C-alpha cells in the first residue's frame, strides 16, 4: 500500500468490476436528473470524507494557531466553509447512524456505542442513491456493529480498527490484513475503486471514513518526529474547576488524571502497569520490525526523559497536554496529506466540476479545553464539527456559510443533490438551499436539538439533552442527576458560567425552555414524557 509520504505515483490494481443494474424508484432517476442550475447535465457524483474526532480548531481554515492543513484549506478556499456546523449526538457510532439516516438517535435506534446495534434494514441515503442508479461504496471505519447495507462495494474495519497493518472485513465474507499505515491504506482503496472498479458510465457516491484521528493517536513512521519542537498554547480553561457544573466535574476524561500514561502517551516501561497497557502492547505488536524500530527510535528518548525527571503537579499536567497535542497533530498531518491525494485524483481526471466533495468529522473533540480530551458533552468543542465542501458547477455559494447545520442534514442533502425526493420521515434539512445561490435563503432554522445517551460508560459523561440557538444553550443532565445548565454564548463563549436560575435570566430561560419543548415535539423524542416541560 502507498504511504502518504511516498512521492511515487499510486500504483492502482488493474481490476474492473461492473456495478449492479439500477433499481427502479419512484423519485427522479439519475438518468433524467437536472442539475442544480436546472439545465440538463450528467448526474452529480458525491465524495464524502469523514474522519473521527477531528475537531474544527485543529484545521487551519478554522484556526491558524495550531497546524497547517493545506489540503483541507483548499476545500474551504475554493468551496464553502460552514462556521456553525454541529452534531446531534457527539459519539462515533451514533453520529454515523445520524448521518446515514438523517434522523436523531432515538429515531434511528443507535443510541450509544456500548448498548446499540444498527438496524441495517432501515432506509439510509446510500440505499436511496443505489436504487436511483448510483454506484455506492464505503471504505474504512463503520463502527455500527452490523455489516453495511446499501453499498455495491465495501471494506470496513472491525470496530475501531488499527493504525498499523490493519484488518479489513470484506463483503466477500473474509478478513484480510493490509500492510502499511491505515489512513494511506483507506485512501488507496478508495482511489483504486474510483480508477479500476466502478462502472464509469454511472454516477457514484464514495464514502471514505477514516479511523484517524481517533485515540490513541499513533502517527505514521514518516511523521513521528513532527511537532516535537512545538509548544502548543495551553487553553485558558485548562484548569477549569467546574464550579456550578456537577456533571462536568463527574467526567473521567481529564488529560491530567485520565490519559493512560502508556496507552495514550506511549511511555512504555516494563516496571509500570496501567489499565490499558495490554491493549497498547497488542497495538504495537501489529507493527513489523521496521515500523517498530522507527517507533521505538522516536519514543525511547522521550520515555527515558519522562521516567528520569519525574514531573509532578502543573508541570506533569502540561507535559501530558503537550505530548497529547503533538501526537494528535502528527495524525492530522497524515490525514491532510491523504485528503490531498483524493483532491488531486479528482482534479487530474476532470471530475471536480461534476462532484460534490464533503469533508467533516463525526464530532468535535477537546484539545485541553476544560482540561479534557474526548467528546460527548453538548459543550461547544464537541458539539461543533468541521464541515467544508467543494461544490460542483451549478451551485453558486462560496465562502463562509453561517447558518446552523447538523449532521442529520447530510442525508437529505445528498438525496436532493441526486434529484431524489427526500422522505418525509427524515428529520434533517437539505442544505441545498444554502448551496444553490450566492446569498443563501432568507429563512433558516434558528436552533438545534442535541441528545447524548451513553451513561454509565467510558468517561462517565452523564446523559443529557438540550437546545442551542444563535446565542444561548440550555441543557438538562438526567438519569442519576437532575441538573440544568444555561449559557450565554456571546458573553461566555467558553461556557464557564452556568446562569440557570440566576436572577435576571427568567425570561431567557422560559424562552429556551419553549424552544426545547418544541424541538422534542418536532423530533418526537420520548424523553419529553419522562421529563415534561410545561
Model regions and ranges:
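Residues forming the ATP-binding cleft of Hanks-type serine/threonine protein kinase domains
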Residues: 490
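Formylglycine-dependent sulfatase
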Residues: 2-3, 10-18, 22, 28-478, ...
Amino acid at each position: 500500500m502507498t504511504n502518504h509520504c511516498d512521492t511515487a505515483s499510486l500504483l492502482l490494481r488493474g481490476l474492473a468490476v461492473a456495478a449492479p443494474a439500477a433499481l427502479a424508484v419512484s423519485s427522479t432517476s439519475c438518468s433524467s436528473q437536472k442539475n442544480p442550475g436546472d439545465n440538463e447535465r450528467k448526474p452529480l457524483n458525491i465524495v464524502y470524507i469523514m474522519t473521527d474526532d477531528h475537531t474544527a480548531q485543529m484545521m487551519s481554515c478554522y484556526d491558524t494557531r495550531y497546524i497547517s492543513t493545506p489540503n483541507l484549506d483548499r476545500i474551504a478556499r475554493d468551496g464553502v466553509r460552514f462556521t456553525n456546523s454541529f452534531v446531534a449526538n457527539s459519539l462515533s457510532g451514533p453520529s454515523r447512524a445520524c448521518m446515514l439516516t438523517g434522523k436523531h438517535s432515538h429515531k434511528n435506534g443507535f443510541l450509544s456505542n456500548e448498548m446499540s446495534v444498527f438496524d441495517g434494514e432501515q432506509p439510509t441515503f446510500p440505499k436511496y442513491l443505489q436504487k436511483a442508479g448510483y454506484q455506492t461504496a464505503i471504505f474504512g471505519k463503520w463502527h455500527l456493529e452490523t455489516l453495511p447495507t446499501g453499498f455495491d462495494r465495501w471494506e470496513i474495519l472491525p470496530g475501531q480498527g488499527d493504525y498499523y497493518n490493519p484488518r479489513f472485513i470484506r463483503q466477500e465474507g473474509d478478513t484480510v490484513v493490509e500492510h502499511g499505515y491505515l489512513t494511506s491504506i483507506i485512501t488507496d482503496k478508495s482511489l483504486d475503486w474510483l480508477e479500476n472498479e466502478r462502472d464509469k458510465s454511472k454516477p457514484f457516491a464514495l464514502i471514505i471514513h477514516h479511523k484517524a484521528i481517533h485515540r490513541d493517536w499513533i502517527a505514521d513512521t514518516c511523521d513521528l518526529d513532527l511537532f516535537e519542537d512545538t509548544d502548543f498554547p495551553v487553553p485558558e480553561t485548562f484548569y477549569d474547576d467546574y464550579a456550578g457544573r456537577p456533571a462536568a466535574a463527574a467526567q473521567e476524561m481529564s488529560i491530567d488524571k485520565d490519559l493512560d500514561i502508556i496507552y495514550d502517551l506511549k511511555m512504555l516501561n516494563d516496571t509500570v502497569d496501567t489499565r490499558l497497557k495490554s491493549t497498547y502492547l497488542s497495538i504495537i505488536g501489529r507493527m513489523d520490525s521496521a515500523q517498530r524500530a522507527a517507533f521505538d527510535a522516536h519514543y525511547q528518548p522521550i520515555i527515558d526523559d519522562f521516567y528520569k525527571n519525574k514531573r509532578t503537579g502543573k508541570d506533569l499536567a502540561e507535559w501530558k497536554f503537550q505530548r497529547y497535542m503533538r501526537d494528535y497533530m502528527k495524525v492530522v498531518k497524515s490525514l491532510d496529506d491523504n485528503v490531498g491525494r483524493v483532491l488531486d485524483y479528482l482534479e487530474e481526471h476532470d471530475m471536480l466540476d461534476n462532484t460534490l466533495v464533503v469533508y467533516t468529522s463525526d464530532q468535535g473533540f477537546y484539545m485541553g479545553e476544560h482540561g479534557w480530551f474526548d467528546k460527548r458533552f453538548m459543550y461547544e468543542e464537541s458539539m461543533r464539527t468541521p464541515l467544508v465542501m467543494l461544490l460542483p458547477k451549478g451551485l453558486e455559494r462560496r465562502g463562509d456559510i453561517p447558518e446552523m447545520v447538523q449532521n442529520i442534514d447530510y442525508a437529505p442533502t445528498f438525496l436532493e443533490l441526486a434529484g431524489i425526493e427526500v422522505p418525509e420521515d427524515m428529520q434533517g434539512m437539505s442544505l441545498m438551499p444554502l448551496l444553490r445561490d450566492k446569498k443563501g435563503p432568507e429563512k433558516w432554522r434558528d436552533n438545534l436539538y442535541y441528545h447524548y445517551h451513553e451513561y454509565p460508560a467510558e468517561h462517565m459523561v452523564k446523559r443529557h439533552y438540550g437546545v442551542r440557538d444563535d446565542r444561548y444553550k440550555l441543557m438538562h443532565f438526567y438519569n442519576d442527576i437532575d441538573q440544568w445548565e444555561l449559557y450565554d454564548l456571546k458573553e461566555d463563549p467558553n461556557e464557564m458560567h452556568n446562569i440557570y436560575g440566576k436572577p435576571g435570566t427568567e425570561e431567557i430561560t422560559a424562552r429556551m425552555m419553549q424552544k426545547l419543548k418544541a424541538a422534542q415535539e418536532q423530533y418526537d423524542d420520548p424523553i419529553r414524557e419522562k421529563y415534561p416541560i410545561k
